[in-house]
């Protein structure tokens, strides 16, 4: 039951999905959506619904509805029916129909007597109101999609048309859906109108029903039609403003027919001979490639305007009808027109079957259709697909067998002992001079580059073309391409039948075939012969006089119409302003650049021949509405922009409305509220932040206001002229009238007040004031020089050291510090500047708000206030003195009085004490003495207490004598009692203790009493001051708590880093101990996966491999599995067990998989290969998926110092910088020379090619664990020796006997070689500069080398620790590719910028020091200094041509080195002249090295763009403004110093050096290089050829001259000779495929790939198993194969990646962080079958 329910549920779901995805439902949905695309056409329908009433009103409603529906039906039909769509979509038809109709409709509704027929009946035909309502709704529904931009919902219909098979059903259903939506909309409108009529509150409005407004309401109802027409007109004008009509567009001047021939790659396939005229496909654009033939003189050129057709008179047929950007193609000098999709579907034959090609040339398909319509006999009969496929497969099988036989024959010839040079297939080259053996350049060689070749020839100027020139050259000008497209014919027989043809015009290059030539096909029918006669009679010439045959030409006159072609070679308005356009370019700009004006700021008049001008482009501050669009283009498809301000700087679409600052009513930002609440808790710096924010907002508002004022002056007519004259008049009035009058008035007043006049000081300040004329944007010129075109462009007047009238000048000698400070302040005010306004005011910036002048009367009022203050304070000082003296006298009197009272009381007490008798007890004299002493003490203490009590109550004793007597009596009693108590206590003590003890205890009691009294005093003082102490403690505690809280994150992070550091160090130390224990018991195992990082003095620098350099990618390709050698400890201890027969096969297989040893006795069983997906492997490395922002956080500013301070091995002899530089230069020179000579070694090339093949092996994973790695084992010895030989390594003879490789034998320093030339050969000696990969070395483990004692740091690789001077290199994948080490180390700090910088610019740093040849200075780059730069910036074709020139000039250098250098410079200049376009004649002048370098870079490296640093740009402009003034001054010191003090001129960007190279500008951060996407059509065939043809072996590489051999022997050291003499198994690298040429090799590979019958493969990803077909072959296991190892190595199977270009492009995405948007398919691997040995 559950199964049945689920089955029913599944059926229901599938049924629902089918219904939803059906054509009818989707059509209804899209039709319903188009209802909401409400446009101006709805205005007529609503007006008919609202306004018209009665019987006529109902008819109008019906007619409006029917017209509306009919118009929408026509729109839907036009989607399906192409002619109707073209008729409605033509811009001239819409313009002709729409604009007059709109005009007629506007006048009809606004003019009362326009169509007034008087009283007519309803049935008369003259009443056109109902018909007009129908037409209005019909026509405006058609206009809505074409003349007015429609909604996006209406365009969704066209999207679904590509997916839908039954298009008519979709159109019908969408119309029905629209009809349903329209009916619902109309019903809703009717309900709204009924609700308005029935609502009494609206109808019973007092204002509407009042008598005052009845007339207005009636007028409003009568003129409703006029209001609707006005609304319609406004909407139409608004829409047409964004999409101008073609009738008002800009007409471009027609370019002459003598322009360069341009076109696409299909049109460039021309012969190598010069073609002075274009071919029949004269137009470069594919769409307009109709037949056009050359005519001597055309009658249309002399036609009057009324004789021309109406369409060409009104409309510009050369108009660019889309808002296209103009992109110039450097190679063919034509525009890139991409109006269509890059995919064009058409049927073609592929693999012998009719298939749909998605990149078919659209012009070819349209031409086929035209020919088939015009000539019925041209249609071919369709043959069965099986017949075609079998015939095609037989031909390809035959070709494959022939190639296989040829390859086997060549291999057999190699076995017989033939030389390799004779066996290898040579590339066929075209030569144009057999005696000198000069070949064509490779870019023009048809045997190398196929269809991508082409030579562009310029026609002579139009004035030179005459009739004689045409008649002389007309014979060889017609290169007909149609015969190659239509049918295959035998051209020799065809030339015999048509004898009057010129043989040169129809001759085709004969292809070379290694086997039999293709069979000649005959013309089977007479119809085909008629076709070719029809096509070729047009250019049939007479053999005698070579004149055109007029008879056939007149018959073919209809086809010679002028083809509408686009005008190209347009220049922008900016280029016109800069004045750098070319000679043959029209002066009128055709591109709308950003609105700007060219302002000349300096002219050099010293040279009489030519005037150099320095100019700046002043751009308008408004939004750039032009956006580099071609003039005359219609902008209907531009993004919709809305303007709501008078001057809007940043216009944007309403889509981005949420990004602008909105009002509080329209936005509720919760995050902002949270921030405000949290900010309120922070009480510190709250006010300061508010003030800063207010100031920033105020500055933004002020800047916006200034821009608006500047734009208003610049936009209105004659505004700049009026402003300029006003400024000059204000300047003259200020300088010569107002200020002198003020000086006279001031000094005359001083004289009247009997003060010394200050004529000299005032006149000195007045003369110092300068009125400098500036450009409109503030560039200073001089006092007398006006800027060019200042009346139209505008002017500013800057006042330097403005004069301010002062009431007096202070004296020079002011000693006090306060006076000095005032003086510096006054000096700063003097050095200030200001700009003059129209009203004579002063502003800090142009068009800024007026600033306050220092007031003349303010210092006077200050001085008066001071003096009045002094006068007021004099009488009060006398009174104060008297008061102070009176208070002192009173105090003295009080003190005397108190002293007298104290003395009188003391005398009285003494008298009483003396009058009392002394009681002497019956004891010894000693005891009496002691008792007397105690009594005295007690009396003194009592006396003190008594005195205190007397002091406290002295006032009471004065008042009453009775109280005094009582107190005295009480005191006496207390004393006597106290004395008695003391005596009793003492007696008791004496009875128990001795006399000495008694004396000691009494002293203790007395000290205790004293301490207690002191404590009492201190306690009272502490209580009094405790309040302040508590406050102080609270403050200190709060400060300490705050500091502790702020230090918590720092402490925790520090503890965390220290803990992680210690943990990692312990972990590393333990691992190292384990590995050392294992390595003591085992031998060296050469395997790449066990590479250990170099550790200097127990230091581990964790260089992160996240940089993903090129070397790392290759390293990961070669590393497949990691073996765990700890499990094989017992096996690895003995080498005997490896070759033993008693070891298990599993262990042998494991060792064989890892490539540890040669296992020769085991049978070779080959594995089944699987497709390893490159992209999935890259995706698995998730750590490389970081965004660029995360990488940017790791960048440090001092990475350069780290790189320069790094060193590999410290050599104590290299102490001086000079000796190091010299040695470095010698080593680099030797390495470069040795590398250049290694190029000529064929063995080196074979080894290099085999390294690439090794990585191809490694890129495949094995399905079985049994994997033959004999290739990697055999590579070991040769690769090690080649690496040591190449890099000049000493002591290599001992490497075989050493367990580890010592770094000290290496003499190359990776980190200190900043110039990359020794590692990447940029001196044009190599063809592949960036992709050069040298032979690598398989190293197992490197020992620790003892360097200087350094601390162990975890973050050392980031360059954060400056104290590290010699960090070691731990990434040993660079041992295989040392060229890429510097790239990778810098790539880790700046992973998206540094590789581009280093690859392009670092070779500029290498400058030859030991130059012994003296040369004359030329205007071009010196050959030795910047030769590498020149060759790098040239493209590869020119570089190869320069290689040949350089190799040929080597012989001349020995004979005459100076002449050889000059010749070499000439050839370089010739190459540069060909690559660079010709400038105007007045611009041909000598340039500096930096200018030429920049030009070369910008022309050749079109994939990158240079831009200024944004902060640096403003600094340069400020400096330029000051420079322009300083140049014109005789003594500029004062103004220069003042401008530096004001901050106008920054010293950090001054040009101290004369010649700044581009690399230095990059390092300083002045120029920034960025990748940019350009729509330049790259030479795809050339890229494929160079990528796949890596192993190209040329003939000249096998020849080594004698002098090269001698130099090689000299350069080889004794250690290198040991490595060279070692046995090298070069045959192991050899691939049988390399015998064939690259072209034949590709053909052989493709033919093998076509045979897909017996191939078995599976994808590693299981989800693709069902979809992917068989792609690879499995090696056939044959029993008759020889098991001898040498033969197996010779006929080893070879893996070839079928799509290596995709592999490299995918890797390139990770090297340089560049993507081109293509989706790369997986790598498909093909394996050759093994050849049997006879």
UniProtKB/Swiss-Prot annotation:
Keyword Acetylation, does the record have it?
no
**From its record, what is one biological process in GO terms?**
protein transport
Q: Name one Pfam family in it.
A: Ycf1
Give the record's membrane topology: Multi-pass membrane protein
Entry keywords, A to Z? Chloroplast, Coiled coil, Membrane, Plastid, Plastid inner membrane, Protein transport, Transmembrane, Transmembrane helix, Transport
Q: Does the keyword Ion transport apply?
A: no
InterPro entries, per this entry?
Answer: TIC214 (IPR008896)
Q: What's one GO-annotated cellular component? A: chloroplast inner membrane
Entry's transmembrane regions: 19-39, 68-88, 91-111, 133-153, 176-196, 227-247
- Ranges in coiled-coil conformation: 1433-1485
Provide the protein's localization: Plastid, Chloroplast inner membrane
Q: What else is known?
A: There is a partial copy of the N-terminus (positions 1-302) of ycf1 in the inverted repeat (BAF50510).
Job description of the protein: Involved in protein precursor import into chloroplasts. May be part of an intermediate translocation complex acting as a protein-conducting channel at the inner envelope.
Q: What is its quaternary makeup?
A: Part of the Tic complex.
* Family to which the UniProt record says this protein belongs: Belongs to the TIC214 family.
Mind telling me what this protein is named?
Answer: Protein TIC 214
């Amino acid at each position: 039951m559950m199964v049945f329910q689920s089955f029913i549920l599944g059926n229901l779901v599938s049924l629902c999905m089918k219904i939803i995805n059906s054509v009818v439902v989707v059509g209804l949905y899209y039709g319903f959506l188009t209802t909401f695309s409400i446009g101006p056409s709805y205005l007529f329908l609503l007006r008919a619904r609202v306004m018209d009433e009665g019987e006529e009103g109902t008819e109008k409603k019906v007619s409006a509805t029917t017209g509306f529906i009919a118009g929408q039906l026509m729109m839907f039909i036009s989607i399906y029916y192409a002619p109707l769509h073209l008729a409605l979509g033509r811009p001239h038809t819409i313009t002709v129909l729409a604009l007059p109709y709109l005009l007629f409709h506007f006048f009809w509704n606004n003019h009362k007597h326009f169509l007034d027929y008087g009283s007519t009946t309803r049935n008369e035909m003259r009443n056109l109101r109902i018909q007009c309502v129908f037409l209005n709704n019909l026509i405006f529904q058609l206009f809505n999609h074409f003349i007015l931009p429609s909604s996006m919902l209406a365009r969704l219909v066209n999207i679904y048309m590509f997916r839908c098979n039954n298009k008519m059903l979709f159109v019908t259903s969408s119309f029905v859906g629209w009809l349903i939506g329209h009916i619902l909309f109309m019903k809703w409108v009717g309900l709204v109108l009924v609700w308005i009529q029935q609502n009494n509150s609206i109808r019973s409005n007092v204002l509407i029903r009042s008598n005052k407004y009845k007339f207005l309401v009636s007028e409003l109802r009568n003129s409703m039609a006029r209001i609707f027409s006005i609304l319609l007109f406004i909407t139409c004008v608004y829409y047409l403003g964004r999409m101008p009509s073609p009738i008002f567009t800009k007409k471009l001047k027609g370019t002459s027919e003598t322009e360069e021939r341009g076109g696409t790659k299909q049109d460039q396939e021309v012969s190598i001979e010069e073609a002075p005229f274009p071919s029949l496909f004269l137009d470069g654009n594919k769409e307009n490639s109709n037949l056009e033939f050359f005519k001597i003189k055309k009658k249309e050129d002399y036609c009057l305007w009324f004789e021309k057709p109406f369409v060409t008179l009104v409309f510009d047929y050369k108009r660019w009808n889309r808002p296209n950007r103009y992109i110039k193609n450097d190679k063919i000098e034509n525009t890139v027109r991409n109006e269509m999709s890059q995919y064009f579907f058409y049927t073609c034959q592929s693999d012998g079957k009719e298939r749909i090609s998605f990149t078919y040339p659209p012009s070819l398909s349209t031409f086929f259709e035209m020919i088939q319509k015009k000539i019925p006999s041209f249609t071919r009969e369709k043959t069965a697909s099986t017949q075609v496929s079998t015939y095609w497969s037989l031909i390809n099988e035959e070709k494959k067998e022939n190639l296989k036989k040829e390859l086997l024959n060549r291999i057999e010839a190699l076995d017989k002992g033939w030389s390799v040079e004779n066996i290898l297939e040579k590339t066929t080259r075209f030569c144009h001079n057999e005696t000198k053996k000069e070949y064509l350049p490779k870019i023009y060689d048809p045997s190398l580059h196929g269809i991508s070749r082409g030579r562009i020839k310029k026609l002579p100027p139009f004035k030179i073309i005459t009739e004689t020139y045409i008649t002389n050259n007309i014979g060889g000008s017609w290169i007909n391409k149609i015969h190659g497209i239509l049918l295959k014919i035998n051209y020799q027989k065809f030339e015999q039948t048509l004898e009057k043809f010129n043989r040169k015009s129809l001759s085709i290059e004969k292809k070379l075939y290694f086997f039999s030539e293709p069979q000649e096909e005959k013309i089977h029918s007479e119809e085909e012969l008629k076709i070719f006669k029809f096509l070729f009679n047009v250019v049939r010439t007479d053999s005698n006089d070579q004149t055109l045959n007029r008879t056939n030409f007149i018959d073919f006159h209809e086809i010679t119409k002028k083809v509408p072609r686009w005008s190209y070679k347009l220049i922008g308005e900016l280029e016109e302003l800069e004045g750098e356009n070319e000679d043959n370019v029209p002066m009128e700009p055709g591109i709308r650049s950003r609105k700007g004006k060219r302002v000349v700021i300096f002219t050099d008049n010293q040279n009489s021949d030519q005037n150099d001008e320095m100019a700046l482009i002043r751009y308008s501050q408004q939004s750039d509405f032009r956006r580099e669009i071609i003039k005359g283009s219609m902008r209907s498809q531009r993004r919709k922009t809305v303007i709501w301000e008078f001057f809007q700087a940043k216009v944007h679409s309403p889509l981005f409305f949420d990004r602008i600052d909105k009002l509080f009513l329209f936005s509720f930002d919760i995050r902002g509220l949270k921030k405000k609440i949290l900010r309120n808790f922070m009480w510190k710096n709250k006010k300061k932040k508010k003030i800063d924010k207010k100031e920033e907002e105020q500055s933004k508002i002020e800047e916006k206001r200034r821009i608006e004022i500047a734009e208003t002056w610049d936009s209105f007519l004659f505004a700049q002229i009026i402003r300029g004259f006003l400024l000059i008049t204000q300047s003259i009035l200020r300088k010569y009238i107002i200020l002198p009058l003020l000086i006279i008035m001031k000094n005359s007043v001083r004289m009247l007040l009997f003060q010394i006049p200050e004529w000299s000081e005032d006149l000195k300040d007045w003369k110092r004031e300068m009125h400098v004329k500036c450009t409109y944007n503030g560039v200073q010129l001089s006092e007398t020089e006006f800027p060019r075109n200042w009346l139209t462009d505008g002017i500013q007047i800057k006042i330097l050291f403005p004069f301010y009238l002062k009431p007096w000048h202070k004296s020079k000698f002011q000693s006090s510090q306060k006076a000095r400070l005032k003086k510096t302040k006054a000096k700063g005010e003097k050095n200030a500047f200001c700009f003059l306004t129209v009203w004579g005011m002063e502003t800090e910036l142009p068009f800024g708000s007026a600033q306050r002048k220092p007031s003349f009367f303010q210092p006077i009022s200050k001085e008066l206030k001071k003096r009045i203050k002094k006068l007021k304070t004099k009488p009060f000082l006398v009174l104060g003195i008297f008061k102070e003296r009176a208070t002192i006298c009173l105090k003295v009197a009080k003190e005397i009085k108190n002293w007298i009272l104290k003395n009188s009381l003391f005398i009285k007490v003494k008298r009483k004490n003396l009058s009392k008798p002394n009681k002497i007890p019956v004891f010894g004299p000693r005891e009496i003495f002691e008792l007397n002493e105690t009594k005295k003490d007690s009396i003194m203490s009592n006396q003190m207490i008594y005195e205190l009590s007397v002091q406290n109550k002295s006032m009471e004793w004065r008042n009453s004598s009775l109280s005094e007597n009582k107190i005295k009596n009480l005191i006496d009693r207390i004393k006597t009692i106290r004395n008695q108590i003391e005596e009793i206590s003492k007696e008791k003590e004496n009875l128990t203790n001795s006399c000495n003890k008694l004396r000691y205890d009494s002293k203790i009691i007395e000290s205790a009493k004293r301490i207690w009294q002191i404590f009492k005093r201190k306690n009272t003082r502490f209580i009094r001051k405790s309040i302040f102490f508590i406050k102080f403690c609270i403050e200190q505690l709060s400060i300490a708590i705050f500091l502790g809280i702020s230090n918590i994150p720092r402490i925790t992070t520090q503890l965390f880093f220290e803990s992680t550091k210690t943990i990692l160090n312990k972990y590393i130390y333990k691992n190292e101990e384990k590995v050392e224990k294992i390595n003591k018991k085992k031998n060296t195992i050469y395997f790449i996966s066990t590479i250990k990082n170099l550790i200097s003095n127990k230091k581990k620098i964790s260089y992160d491999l996240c940089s993903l350099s090129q070397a790392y990618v290759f390293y990961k390709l070669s590393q497949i599995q990691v073996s765990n050698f700890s499990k094989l400890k017992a096996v690895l201890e003995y080498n005997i067990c490896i070759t033993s027969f008693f070891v298990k096969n599993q262990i042998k297989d494991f060792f064989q998989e890892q490539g540890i040893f040669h296992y020769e006795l085991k049978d070779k069983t080959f594995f089944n290969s699987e497709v390893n997906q490159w992209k999935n492997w890259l995706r698995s490395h998730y750590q490389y998926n970081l965004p660029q922002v995360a990488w940017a956080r790791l960048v440090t500013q001092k990475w350069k110092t780290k790189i320069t301070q790094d060193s590999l091995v410290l050599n104590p002899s290299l102490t001086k910088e000079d000796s190091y530089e010299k040695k470095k230069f010698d080593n680099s020179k030797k390495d470069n020379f040795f590398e250049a000579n290694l190029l000529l070694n064929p063995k080196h090339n074979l080894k290099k090619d085999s390294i690439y093949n090794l990585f191809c092996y490694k890129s495949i994973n094995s399905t079985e664990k049994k994997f033959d790695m004999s290739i990697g084992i055999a590579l070991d010895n040769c690769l090690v020796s080649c690496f040591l030989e190449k890099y000049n390594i000493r002591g290599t003879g001992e490497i075989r006997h050493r367990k580890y490789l010592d770094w000290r034998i290496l003499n190359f320093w990776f980190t200190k070689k900043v110039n990359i030339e020794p590692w990447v050969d940029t001196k044009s000696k190599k063809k592949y500069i960036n992709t050069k990969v040298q032979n690598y070395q398989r190293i197992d483990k490197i020992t620790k080398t003892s360097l200087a004692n350094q601390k162990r740091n975890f973050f050392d690789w980031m360059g954060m620790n400056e104290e590290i001077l010699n960090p070691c290199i731990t990434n040993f994948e660079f041992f295989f590719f040392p060229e890429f080490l510097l790239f990778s180390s810098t790539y880790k700090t700046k992973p998206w910028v540094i590789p581009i910088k280093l690859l392009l610019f670092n070779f500029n740093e290498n400058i030859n020091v030991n130059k012994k040849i003296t040369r004359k200075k030329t205007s071009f780059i010196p050959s030795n200094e910047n030769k590498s730069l020149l060759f790098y910036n040239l493209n590869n074709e020119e570089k190869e041509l320069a290689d040949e020139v350089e190799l040929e000039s080597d012989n001349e250098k020995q004979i005459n080195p100076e002449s050889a250098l000059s010749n070499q410079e000439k050839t370089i200049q010739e190459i540069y002249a060909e690559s660079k376009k010709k400038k105007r004649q007045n611009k041909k002048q000598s340039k500096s090295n930096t200018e030429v370098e920049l030009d070369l870079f910008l022309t050749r490296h079109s994939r990158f763009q240079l831009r200024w640093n944004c902060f640096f740009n403003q600094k340069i402009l400020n400096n330029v403004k000051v420079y322009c003034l300083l140049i014109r001054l005789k003594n500029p010191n004062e103004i220069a110093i003042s401008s530096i003090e004001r901050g106008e001129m920054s010293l950090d960007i001054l040009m101290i050096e004369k010649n700044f190279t581009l690399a230095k500008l990059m390092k300083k951060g002045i120029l920034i290089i960025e990748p940019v996407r350009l729509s330049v059509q790259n030479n795809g065939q050339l890229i494929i050829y160079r990528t796949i043809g890596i192993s190209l072996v040329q003939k000249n590489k096998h020849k080594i001259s004698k002098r090269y051999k001698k130099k090689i022997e000299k350069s080889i050291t004794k250690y290198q000779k040991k490595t060279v003499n070692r046995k090298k198994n070069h045959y192991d690298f050899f691939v049988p495929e390399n015998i064939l040429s690259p072209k034949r090799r590709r053909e052989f590979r493709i033919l093998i790939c076509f045979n897909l019958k017996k191939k078995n493969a599976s994808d590693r990803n299981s989800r693709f198993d069902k979809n992917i077909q068989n792609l690879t072959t499995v090696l056939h296991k044959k029993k008759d194969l020889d098991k001898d190892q040498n033969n197996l190595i010779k006929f080893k199977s070879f893996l070839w990646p079928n799509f290596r270009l995709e592999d490299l492009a995918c890797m390139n995405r990770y090297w340089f962080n560049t993507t081109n948007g293509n989706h790369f398919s997986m790598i498909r691997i093909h394996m050759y079958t093994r050849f049997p040995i006879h």
